[in-house]
């Protein structure tokens, strides 16, 4: 499957995302004025935003126009984060696997979609799609 990499760029103060060929495909940067995380494509066009919603104790995701796209919420009972679409349907879950030292991503049916693993040598997170 396709592999992706994310790495923090100190010079630009942002997290950058690369495809398996090493090409920049986008980046995320914190906007302190609006107190949110903003995601951009490689050309600098805003794609989406993430912002903590204290009323519902979750992270809301909105498109570039401000329309609700979904949210992420912590499920302490199952010790995982859950991602939902704007209608409240679960899209995927993310859970830490202590044995393999990685974040595993599962679809709404419980099938593993891939995982994030820290690459010590390159100081980055690698995503391996299943």
Regions found by a protein language model. Give the residues of each.
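Repetitive, compositionally biased segments used for assembly/scaffolding
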Residues: 1-130
């Amino acid at each position: 499957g396709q592999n992706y990499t994310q790495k923090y760029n100190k010079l630009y103060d942002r997290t950058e995302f690369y495809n398996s060929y090493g090409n920049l495909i986008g980046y995320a940067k914190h906007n302190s004025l609006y107190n949110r995380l903003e995601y951009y494509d490689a050309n600098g066009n805003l794609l989406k935003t993430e912002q903590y919603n204290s009323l519902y104790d979750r992270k809301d995701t909105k498109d570039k126009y401000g329309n609700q796209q979904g949210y992420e919420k912590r499920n302490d009972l199952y010790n995982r984060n859950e991602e939902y679409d704007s209608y409240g349907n679960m899209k995927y879950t993310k859970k830490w696997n202590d044995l393999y030292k990685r974040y595993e991503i599962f679809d709404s049916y419980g099938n593993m979609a891939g995982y994030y693993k820290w690459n010590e040598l390159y100081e980055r997170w690698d995503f391996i799609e299943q």
